[in-house]
Amino acid sequence: MIKQIVTALKANPSVSGWLVNETVTVSSQVFYVMQKKETTRRVETREYQVTVYHRHGEQNAFVGSSMFAVSRKLTKAELARKIEEAVFAARFVKNKAFDLVKGAGKRTWKEKPETADPYVILDDIANTFFAAATPVSRFNALEAFHARQTIRILNSEGVDFTKTQSKIDIEAIPSHDGPERKVELIRMFTYKTVDLDLVKKDAAVAIADVALRYDARKLENVPKADVILAGDDVEDFLRELIGDFSYDGVYRKSTDKKIGDAIQSEIQGDALSIGWTLSSKADAFDRDGVMLAPVRVVEAGKLVGYYGSNQYAQYLGLQPVGVFGTIEAAAGKTTIARMKAKPHLEIIALSGIQIDIYSGYIGGEVRLAVWFDGKNRIPVSGFSFSGNIDKALSDLVLSKETVQGVRYHGPKCILLKGMDVL
């Protein structure tokens, strides 16, 4: 099919350039209900995304683009019609002209596959989760997915790259059945490789968290507190913090920060070093065909680099570093045990963290947390916290302990000092 698509694109004289993304996914899926296997399924899909570029205007000063998907085999006439429709739509888009990424022949990257059968792997992971259950806390449902995905991109400038990667996704719903009511949580986990010791820890935490949810009470008489974030919330914090430093953000003037400007002023805590990296060696290129290599965005609390797509890099006159999926940050000097030695709020479930550099705001709505008053750990819920982002960054504490997941490498926890509790 990909040859047919490329031939049809080349046949249309109004197509100034093109990009084809072919994604083949082989997914092994297992569904468990009340800790018993219900259904197994194997799904194989092959999908194409075709982006058509059309230069127009005086001296071809503008380039428009339009994308369409192909999920089934099309006749030559159907494909030609889709391309013509995309060209028509692209005529109405007036982006500043830019060049597609240039390539030089085929290149392929591939992660080594697991030797065990995917269903055996998923059963082992599920049974490790179920082993953490107690008489009153168990997993009402668990869905397990093993996906091996091959992505190939070709463009009109000679790019022809292919990468094959695998991952395991788990969606677990732990529940706690108490004498008064039943409560549930939803927990998502992604693994690059099979590490049953890590799975065992994740399962134990999920069961402990749902028990905390059952016992949680309204937080009262705590107007201010240090807040500890962990897990996905740390990743979200870092992504929010550097989100405006993309080429796109700089071009659209979403930030006024220049290279060398301080992100943290008057640092009293840990200086931040944040960047983007590859999830694996096979994660070698981005959606445009830009070759990826680790890049630093913030170093020692200062902005040292932008990042982002080929298009907006050209608008800024910069060499593109690409669009990444995995963020990384340097660890701090403080152990988690030391972080937790003083009174604090440890966030277990957060609806999302919000950061606005220009209004100076940081905050979030908390669904579940643990309040440590210096003596007792008390599960609490139904509140929010907020504070000044500049002050929070100045006093920021990063844990010495780190995690390395698919989308995040860095400190396991961070501590935000003196947040207002609402």
Label for each model-derived stretch:
Residues I2-T7, V15-S28, K76-K163, K201-E235:
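Acidic low-complexity segments
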Residues L9-K10, K37-R41, T128-A133, S156-T164, ...:
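A generic local secondary-structure boundary/capping motif
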Residues S16-Q49, A141-F161, R287-D288, P343-V366:
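Structured beta-strand/loop patches that form or line metal/cofactor-binding pockets in enzymes
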Residues T23, F31, D124-K201, D248-G275:
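Extended amphipathic alpha-helical scaffolds
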Residues S27-F88:
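N-terminal alpha-helical targeting/anchoring segments
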Residues E44-E58, F161-Y191, V297-E299, V366-D373:
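Short beta-strand elements
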Residues A61-R72, G103-Y119, E171-S175, R181-K200:
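Short His/Asp/Glu-rich catalytic/ion-coordination signatures at enzyme active sites or charged loops
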Residues I259-L422:
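Dual-mode signal for accessory low-complexity, basic/Gly-rich regions
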